[in-house]
A protein has these predicted regions:
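Short cytoplasmic-facing helical segments at TM-TM junctions of multi-pass membrane proteins
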Residues: 139, 143-178
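Generic hydrophobic transmembrane alpha-helix motif, especially the helices
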Residues: 99-135, 142-143
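N-terminal signal-anchor/first transmembrane alpha helix
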Residues: 1-26
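C-terminal transmembrane helix and the adjacent membrane-cytosol boundary/short C-terminal tail
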Residues: 88, 145, 176, 180-183, ...
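Transmembrane alpha-helices
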Residues: 126, 130, 162-194, 229
């Protein structure tokens, strides 16, 4: 218990030092105070946004977009990755296109997506789904293709059909890869959601709130949004780590 408290204390040392350094720069001049907003102003803005409901409204909108894009991208990614891993024809037909398309940076698709679908909610969700799709498809494919030979031989002994072989042999052994892909996809989904809100500033969202605050020279609000995005991202990463540890531990035990 004592060692854990010491570890927590050391972990808080860097943020505290950064806060003191930030406050030091904010007091150097008026120009510095604009770029490095005093901590007291940031704290005051946080309570202002929390009190009037703006922070909760925009945070929920961003979370909703991230979860929707994450769900769609995960389902499509697992489906396509599994198809390429199981069906040789699908690998031949889809594989080259997939590996070529995933080399294009996501930002490279923004002009076309905006031209084809406009700058509304659909475009934002599409960007998030694409960000999730790539790692999910790749890790599912790698997980299925790297199943060890003895497990495949067990399926042959029991004369499993293609579906039984997938459910009872390939998918269970691919779960570690899939969870690794999901961990990456979750981070990509969160970043892509905020990025799409900054690019397509339509509707509520933390990214849209940051743009409005920037145009109004409210850098304190911008900092509140940035800190909120970072905290939620860390909580997501912590949560998926716990779920991964529990699920894979339970799966291995069974």
């Amino acid at each position: 218990m004592r060692s854990r408290l010491i570890s927590w204390a050391w972990g808080l040392l860097t943020p505290v030092l950064l806060a003191f350094l930030w406050e030091f720069f904010s007091r150097r001049s008026i120009a510095h105070a604009y770029a490095f907003v005093p901590v007291a102003d940031i704290w005051r803005s946080f309570w202002e946004l929390a009190g009037n409901g703006d922070l909760a409204l925009n945070l929920w909108a961003t979370l909703r977009s991230a979860l929707l894009g994450l769900s769609i991208g995960t389902l499509l990614g697992i489906s396509v990755g599994a198809s390429m891993g199981i069906i040789k024809t699908a690998d031949v037909l889809i594989g080259p296109i997939y590996h070529m398309v995933r080399q294009v940076p996501l930002l490279g698709w923004i002009p076309l997506i905006g031209l084809w679908f406009g700058t509304g909610v659909f475009s934002k969700n599409l960007i998030v789904a694409m960000a999730v799709f790539y790692p999910m498809a790749l890790h599912t494919y790698e997980g299925i293709r790297n199943v060890e030979k003895p497990y495949l031989e067990v399926g042959e002994i029991f004369r499993f059909g293609r579906w039984q072989r997938f459910v009872h042999v390939l998918l269970p052994n691919a779960w570690p890869y899939i969870f690794t892909g999901f961990s990456n996809a979750l981070a990509f989904a969160w970043v892509a959601t905020v990025g799409s809100e900054l690019l397509f500033a339509t509707g509520p969202g933390l990214g849209a709130l940051m743009l409005i605050a920037q145009s109004a020279s409210r850098m304190d609000v911008v900092i509140v949004c940035i800190v909120t995005i970072g905290i939620i991202g860390c909580l997501m990463n912590f949560g998926i780590g716990k779920i991964r540890k529990w699920f894979l531990g339970w799966h291995c035990a069974h």
